[in-house]
Amino acid sequence: IKEAILSILPLCDEVIVAVGDCTDGTRELVQAIHPTKIKIIDTVWNTALNRDGIVLADETNKALQAAFATNSHWLIYIQGDEVLHEDGFAAITQAMEKHKDDKKVDGLLLNYRHFYGSYDYIATSSHWYKNEIRIIKNNVNIYSYKDAQGFRKGDNEKLNVKPVDAFVHHYGWVKKPKTMMNKRKEGVKFWEGEKYTEEYDKTDLGDYDFSQIDSLELYKKPHPQVMQQRIINVNWKFNYDVSFNKKTLKDQLKNLLFKLTGKRLFEYQNYKII
């Protein structure tokens, strides 16, 4: 979470962080990131919403409500396992200025890289979303949607967005195999509820098997500056032979169409590009 917050800090006047009721030092870690820019919203997670990831959107909306009360034109959203790459800062600030007063534009659409197993590989099959909204107008009619992957406005209406040449790095699948399995076990309750989690916890599932993946490619570009120390401290290995990728016929067709047209055809879009 530290790197996530640091990655957006240069673009923000204030960063509002929703911190749940915990005793693991998270609140102290967040508060220490910046002496004046950090504002913490203390929350209690509603376990009655532990189904289909709804509780994640509920927590997001708590922070959004605090952000709506500010006089900012734009709100940047980042999740704890995401990092905004500084290479996109100029494009983001230009887009913010250009579309600030355009009432048709609800938000800005960013590109995604999903890292998997280690910081050396990104997932490339079609079920990993290629884009998502991470910057929205300060509009109280906008809210976090379903499992907090994206946003809606009004009566379940998709947001109108402008694409921006900037990348969010998603590192949620880069952990020690044992830590990854523990995360998966803990995360089950947000979709299946506490009762299911109790049964799940009785079983020692060992280490997470990262080899069960259909398609990866090597990442050879720089990571965000805020990630450098974390990457240096890596103490596990994950090696994958990209020649063994098992892309489905569906994915092969989508990739071919993308090369020919430059558009991601037949993929679900949680937004409207205008």
Where are these regions (language model features)?
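Residue-level signal for alpha-helix termini/capping positions
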Residues: 9, 68-69, 97-101
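Short, well-formed alpha-helical segments that are part of the catalytic scaffolds
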Residues: 1-16
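Active-site-proximal specificity loops/subdomain of glycosyltransferases
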Residues: 25-77
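Conserved acidic residues
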Residues: 13, 73, 81, 106, ...
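Acidic donor-binding/catalytic loop of UDP-sugar-dependent glycosyltransferases
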Residues: 25, 74, 78-95
